[in-house]
A protein has these predicted regions:
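Adenosine-phosphate binding glycine-rich loop
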Residues: 116-117, 122-165
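Broad structural signal for hydrophobic residues in well-ordered alpha-helices, predominantly aliphatic
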Residues: 7, 109-110, 157
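Glycine-rich phosphate/diphosphate-binding loop of Rossmann-like nucleotide-binding domains
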Residues: 8-81
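A glycine-rich, Thr/Ser-enriched phosphate-binding loop motif common to dinucleotide/cofactor-binding enzymes
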Residues: 1-6
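Rossmann-like adenosine-cofactor binding region
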Residues: 58-134
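Donor-nucleotide binding loops and adjacent catalytic segments primarily
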Residues: 48, 55, 107, 144-148
């Protein structure tokens, strides 16, 4: 809800592009699943770009991308998700060196993206895993915008649930 509110405030929701592509551990992420459900209710598919071992079992209404170039061609916003080591099962193996090499957002990768890309992150951020140290301060990183929507979004949902709005 907070992420969708942030996307609306940044004018990132439109019919031409996938509203957001999630990058990282979508298999174990509650942020991904709730965002996916809400965007699907609004009539949108969401994108994912991740290691095959971190894809969700249900791939319906997903756009699965194979490269950063595909992500940038199809989405005007991305959300980085941390690998949730504590939720990995014994049979789920992740090679972190390979993961970082393929899926870490770096300044070099950001330089290839569109100038108005919005990069979200639900926090906590693992600098050096899902995002490099040099990329964290880029103007495209919008986690502070997300934080500014957190309380107002929750208040609105609470008031709506109580029929106050």
């Amino acid at each position: 809800m907070i992420d969708i509110s942030t996307l609306f405030s940044l004018n990132k929701i439109n019919e031409k592009l996938t509203p957001i592509t999630y990058i990282g551990d979508v298999k174990h992420s509650r942020v991904f699943e709730s965002g996916r459900q809400l965007l699907n209710l609004l009539g949108f598919k969401v994108g994912v770009f991740t290691d095959k071992n971190l894809l969700p079992e249900n791939k319906n209404d997903l756009e699965i991308y194979e490269s950063w170039d595909e992500v940038f061609e199809s989405s005007n916003a991305i959300e980085l998700l941390r690998v949730q080591k504590e939720r990995l099962q014994d049979n789920e193996e992740i090679n972190f060196d390979e993961y970082i090499n393929n899926y870490q957002l770096t300044q070099e990768i950001l330089g290839k993206s569109q100038s108005d890309l919005a990069v979200l992150h639900p926090m906590p951020i693992n600098i050096g895993i899902e995002i490099s140290k040099d990329a964290i301060e880029d103007r495209k990183i919008k986690y502070k915008d997300q934080l500014s929507h957190a309380i107002p979004s929750r208040i609105a949902a609470f008031k709506y649930a109580r029929d106050e709005i």
